[in-house]
């Protein structure tokens, strides 16, 4: 069986990703021949090398560009890397209906160290955290499998925690305005073990003073105010010296 035939057989069975080691193990296929054939198929836009030793078969609808969107293969890739993950930030917000600030690349959260994805072929914008809160993830069918993504509450908190990564607090607030109806404030307590009180303070401040979501702000305050010993004076951003801080509002957040 030729490599072309082998790839076709995988494709019709719905197996759209494969590793180089699987090709090397084909009967009668030497490693050097396999590398040459794989390189040719990349040039011909039959397959895309999205990670060292990991390939995705390019379906006809993406053949012209030669690049497959990350949602097509992200679950298989992360299983290959043996890393937990979830689609996060602007990409997760879009899945919840907040589409006006959609990210150009698929934003994916995982644990360090950073996967060595090719910048040329990569369609992924990586962010990192200490651990992945799997209990706060949802799943959805993609074109060829499933993807895991953050629930509305984790998405809201991540938008604040990683505001710099997505373009700042103004952009985070714009997305939160669209996302707010999906967020169950009472469930924010489930996110607390995976973030800091400073992030929650900033989220509350934005809800109350930027988005004027008074009811949600009040509810959030009631959820988290029981342990204000962990609250410190914080800045909305870190552009000013801390000695300028004043206890100006109940969230203890200064502009």
Feature roles, as predicted:
Residues 23, 92, 156:
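A residue-level signal for conserved active-site and pocket-lining positions in enzyme catalytic cores
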Residues 6-7, 38-48, 102-111, 120-128, ...:
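Short charge-dense sequence patches
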Residues 11-13, 48, 82, 101, ...:
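A generic structural signal for short, non-catalytic loop/turn and secondary-structure boundary residues
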Residues 20, 49-61, 67-132:
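Short gly/ser-rich loop at a beta-strand->alpha-helix junction or flexible surface loop bordering the NTP-binding
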Residues 137-255:
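Hydrophobic alpha-helical interaction segments
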Residues 31-33, 100-102, 164-168:
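Short amphipathic alpha-helical segments with coiled-coil-like heptad repeat character
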